[in-house]
């Protein structure tokens, strides 16, 4: 049968990336406690593409996803990238999987068991320049109360929900990053609060006011000794404004002198 994709292309234009995206598959993710959490992963996978061929073989991306990634781990992601690089004769490959991750939470006073989902993802790259790199990301919703509003107001203070997105490299569990984020905010969020819980949360937040800047700085100091490379983005959905407040802080990984010469940069982005 004729292989149209492998036919020679006279245009001689290489492509930075070809692949597939928005592929949904059932997966399991390892938890800190040693278990496996079932969830649904949304995948993107692709490679660079040489100038000499007309097209890639898209079906091979699906084949490697089905073959390797029922369970997600750094080892499985690397094996998947090595496989697709070999099958498509590429020099670099990338895969990203986004998934909802469930965490168990007890209400602060009544101790009722609840479950809250956060958005998480793993992005893995394999190429000759950076080698194998995995970046993990999680977005954690929390609660902030404005320090200025509290100090200038005779009664109350404006407060709101905040999304904190952390991307990092290194051996950190999703659960540990979630805990660090929640401890940096005015208060965590809870799917369920009875009246004693609500009283506790609102009063504790009042005693622990945080700007978005405070959350970003406090979280940076906690993550700094734990990861060589990370990015923090704090977004506050202001309750008294039609706009959001934002704070961003990055820590970039140092690279060797040879890497600096070859890449003309002193630090490596971790996102």
UniProtKB/Swiss-Prot annotation:
Gene3D superfamilies: Urate Oxidase. InterPro entries: GTP_cyclohydrolase_FolE2, GTP_cyclohydrolase_FolE2/MptA. It catalyses: GTP + H2O = 7,8-dihydroneopterin 3'-triphosphate + formate + H(+). Keywords: Hydrolase. It holds the Pfam family GCHY-1. One of its GO terms (biological process) is tetrahydrofolate biosynthetic process. The keyword Hydrolase applies. One of its GO terms (molecular function) is GTP cyclohydrolase I activity. Pathway: Cofactor biosynthesis; 7,8-dihydroneopterin triphosphate biosynthesis; 7,8-dihydroneopterin triphosphate from GTP: step 1/1. The record marks 146 as: May be catalytically important. Its EC number is 3.5.4.16. Signal peptide: none annotated. Converts GTP to 7,8-dihydroneopterin triphosphate. Belongs to the GTP cyclohydrolase IV family. This is GTP cyclohydrolase FolE2. It comes from Coprothermobacter proteolyticus (strain ATCC 35245 / DSM 5265 / OCM 4 / BT). The lineage of its organism: Bacteria, Pseudomonadati, Coprothermobacterota, Coprothermobacteria, Coprothermobacterales. The gene is folE2.
